[in-house]
A protein has these predicted regions:
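Short, high-confidence coil segments that cap the C-terminus of an alpha-helix
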Residues: 38-40, 97-100, 225, 342-344
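Active-site/acyl-donor-binding loops of N-acyltransferases
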Residues: 5-8, 31-32, 117-163, 346-408
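A short, internal acetyl-CoA/4′-phosphopantetheine-binding micro-motif in the GNAT/acyltransferase core
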Residues: 73-80, 317-325, 353
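A structural signal for short, well-ordered beta-strand segments and their strand-loop junctions
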Residues: 101-106, 187-189, 229, 346-350, ...
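Conserved acetyl-CoA-binding loop-helix of GNAT-fold acetyltransferases
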Residues: 81-93, 324-338
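A conserved beta-strand-loop-helix scaffold within acyl/acetyltransferase catalytic domains
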Residues: 4-48, 53-64, 138-148, 162-163, ...
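Glycine-/proline-rich flexible loop or hinge segments
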Residues: 66-78, 102, 111-114
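Acyl-donor-binding surface of acyltransferase catalytic domains
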Residues: 84-185, 189, 209-213
Length: 408
């Protein structure tokens, strides 16, 4: 068996039904990265007309030295150690000729499911693949706690067959209903509106202003990406707030009579809470009235979603922090799940941290995603296959590997 370059048709036919198929291992992703500092190759491990493994391999320079990166790992049967070993041996020979100094992989192999309450891990049958890769010469890198690596090590994935607003956390349900009451609307957007997403996410991650537009242009060629925006419908906001105010006013009048007849602390506190709610609704009506005749649509949140196989993945999302009280991020995620529920099996909410403690600086992000009741999966992590130890150790000692790959 030997390694050779595959043409587009060969690769797509092999990849589309593979167990580890993912959007990072697609021709679309190859084209995207080729516009943002990488070269790429599509390779296969073959014997005559049979392909046993394949990969999109990205190539880049660090300090004048070439390295390769295989996002989400090779498309190969990792449980077949003899196949992995043969492939790896040929891989080293193949890329040594191309002056590649090391190959980084982060396979999309789930090794455990984490209980969001107890944080206890239940390991899968894939866990021994760590030892398989190490025996085949791959160096297992330290597992990250937060978001230090290229891709998140822990992902939150919602099974859409289980998805129902009634199953969500109380806080999440309340935030979604608040967004609905405040007149939030959800729409499919176009690439020409990508400036909104760039604005919503500019403090979250540093990207070229053209990066997400390029993403959309390339992935939309085969309809494997969607762009969504959330705006405020102030007319709906007024109507909803008026209805809520009138309903609460009737409740408040009943509570007022109750306090007069039974002036207990509990009744007084309930009446005071109702007074606060009435004031909030009154302020909502005033705010909506003030903005009712704005000459433009006001977008306050957005997301890009990539589709591959039976999974839709929220690639990036963000919202205007001025509208925090509208809970637009909760409304956005809820509507995305509704949008895909009849077409896809899973929604990948993307990364959360391995450290789920309250003390973690990403606790708010974790709790936001956990409120949608996802399954929490831990992936196998990053491995390096060293081809030129001298150059690899040189880059390591100079801190250039950490600079290139550590995302914190």
């Amino acid at each position: 068996m030997y390694i050779r370059e595959l043409n587009a048709e060969e690769y797509e036919n092999f990849a589309k039904n593979h167990k580890y198929a993912n959007y990072h291992q697609t021709l679309n992703y190859a084209m995207l990265k080729s516009e943002h500092d990488y070269e790429y190759e599509i390779i296969g491990f073959c014997d005559d007309d049979t392909i046993y493994a394949a990969a999109l391999v990205l190539v880049k320079l660090i300090d004048g030295y070439l390295y390769a990166y295989v996002p989400e790992g090779f498309l190969i049967d990792y449980e077949n150690e003899s196949l992995v070993r043969l492939f790896t041996d040929e891989l080293i020979k193949y890329y040594k000729k191309e002056d590649i100094n090391f190959i980084k992989i982060n396979p999309s192999i789930i090794i455990s499911e984490i209980d969001p309450k107890t944080h206890i891990k239940t390991y899968t049958d894939n866990y021994p693949i760590i030892n398989t890769l190490e025996r085949c010469g791959y160096i297992k890198l330290n597992d990250n706690t937060n978001f230090e690596s290229i891709l998140p090590r822990v992902n939150a994935i919602v099974n859409l067959n289980e998805f129902n607003i009634n199953n969500l956390s109380k806080n999440t349900k309340n935030k979604i209903r608040k967004g609905i009451r405040k007149g939030l609307t959800f729409e499919v957007a176009e690439n020409s509106q990508m400036n909104y997403l760039n604005e919503f996410t500019k403090r979250k991650i540093k990207r070229s202003e053209f990066y997400y537009s390029d993403y959309y242009n390339i992935f939309s060629r085969n309809h494997s990406i969607d762009y969504f925006l959330v705006s405020v419908d102030y007319e709906k906001y007024i109507l909803n707030s008026q209805m809520a105010y009138e309903k609460e006013l009737k409740k408040n009048e009943r509570l007022n009579n109750k306090v007069k007849n039974i002036p207990k602390t509990r009744n007084i506190n309930t009446k005071m809470n109702s007074d606060k709610t009435l004031l909030a609704y009154k302020n909502d009506i005033a705010l909506a009235s003030k903005n009712l005749n704005k000459p433009f649509k006001e977008y306050i949140a957005g997301a890009l979603v990539v589709k591959n196989g039976d999974t839709a993945t929220i690639l990036i999302s963000g919202y205007d922090k001025k509208y925090y009280d509208f809970a637009p991020n909760y409304f956005l995620y809820f509507m995305i799940m509704n949008y895909y529920q009849n077409e896809y099996k899973y929604i990948n909410l993307n990364g959360i941290t391995a450290d789920l403690s309250k003390e973690n600086k990403y606790h708010g992000l974790n709790e936001f995603k956990l409120g949608f009741k996802p399954h929490i999966y831990e992936y196998i992590g990053e491995f390096d296959l060293v081809i030129n130890p001298h150059i690899y150790n040189k880059l390591l000692k100079k801190g250039l590997l950490e600079k290139e790959f550590n995302k914190n």
